[in-house]
Amino acid sequence: MGEKNEELQILIITGLSGAGKTQAINCLEDIGYYCVDNLPPALMFKFIELSMQSEGIKKVALVIDVRGGDFFPDLSLVLEELEDSQINYQIIFLEASDEVLVRRFKESRRRHPLGSSSRLLEAIQEERRMLQELRGKAHFLIDTSNLSPRELKEKLDLRYSEDETLRFSASIVSFGYKLGLPMDSDLVIDVRFLPNPFYDPLMRTMTGKDPMVIDYVLESSVTKSFTRRFLNLLKYLIPYYIKEGKTNLAIAIGCTGGQHRSVVLADYTGKQLEKMGYNVIVRHRDIAKHKTEE
């Protein structure tokens, strides 16, 4: 074989049709993996051998699934061959619920590899049975039933990107103090000092997602002064958190009921952190629980 590239990183992407393997391979390509989709298992070992001889290839990701037809059962033999040759690899297995997969196939109008549209559910269940043993060998199992493409990308970035900025994520939650503090927060920010839309009859039943409320909160001189200082603080802190090996910063932003001010500030902070290049997930814990007064 010649000089081997012993540092070659090998990812095998597999799982259920419609679970997001194409999106996964695109994400991995974005972070530097040499990607091959629908590689026949019989060619897999030879491809890895050639990649190990190439100085230009450091990371490979291979999508192998039931589209390989009669060749797919060969995958177990190839994995054994890799292990016998002491070649390390990781398996990423993507799946989703039957209901979600049926919906995705109907929306895309694509044919399932194992059957026609008239027996779609049967085809999905048959594929699930075929992949059960391989699923048990997975190093990273991802259920995409409730994941957006962006959230799937964030999961893969956090695990496989060598860029520390990409591996770091901020989780921002808005909440109402009347309903208790989030228990898993690193930073808790009290924004009850900001102007309160609740006391304007037009905005009382609105939320921080409504344009009128957003403008009311963000156009305040107090808010502008606060957000400038708060974002500067985060800009200062986050690089130090990354340096210490922290991969997630949980930020909780609270107002009285979690309906107006905290929602606006959580969304605004999330957008600003994204502009800085960080992965951000924003959720609003109490936005639907605003029956009590702020």
From Swiss-Prot:
InterPro entries: P-loop_NTPase, RapZ-like, RapZ-like_N, RapZ_C. ATP binds at residues 15-22. Keywords: ATP-binding, GTP-binding, Nucleotide-binding. The keyword Nucleotide-binding applies. One of its GO terms (molecular function) is ATP binding. GTP binds at residues 65-68. The keyword ATP-binding applies. Belongs to the RapZ-like family. Displays ATPase and GTPase activities. This is Nucleotide-binding protein Swol_0262. It comes from Syntrophomonas wolfei subsp. wolfei (strain DSM 2245B / Goettingen).
